[in-house]
Amino acid sequence: MTALGAEEIRTRVESDFSRIVDVLNQKIALQSISAKGITADHMKRSAQFVADLLREVGVDTKVVQSHNPDGTPGAWEVIGSKNVSEDAPTVLLYAHHDVQPVPDPNVWNTDPFVGTEIDTRLYGRGAADDGGGIA
């Protein structure tokens, strides 16, 4: 595997930009809220979504549910790995795919779970933290 330079990465992102935005919009719409008392269904769908994205680029993945210290079911997590070369360094990528509840939707100018572009920025719950990195 050959290392990519900054210009090559920039070119690839620019050529794939509309797909990246589409993926981010899909991620925002999943409403992957992680909070006590909220069903984990959205989190499971979000984890599966992230796992599917990783599989598309050749990463072996599995979706697992963690357990809280008290033994109750915890968050849904994605574990992935890809061995490109035995002599390549190990690289760890970490991101969270959940969002926190929206305390007061009335303070939002847009629907928090619909990606909305305003002046070249995309707004939506989790768009920057960490949805953008996932997309």
Question: Model-found features: residue ranges?
Answer:
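Acidic/His- and Gly-rich active-site-bordering loop/insert found
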Residues: 2-127
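Active-site alpha-helical elements of protease catalytic centers
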Residues: 128-135
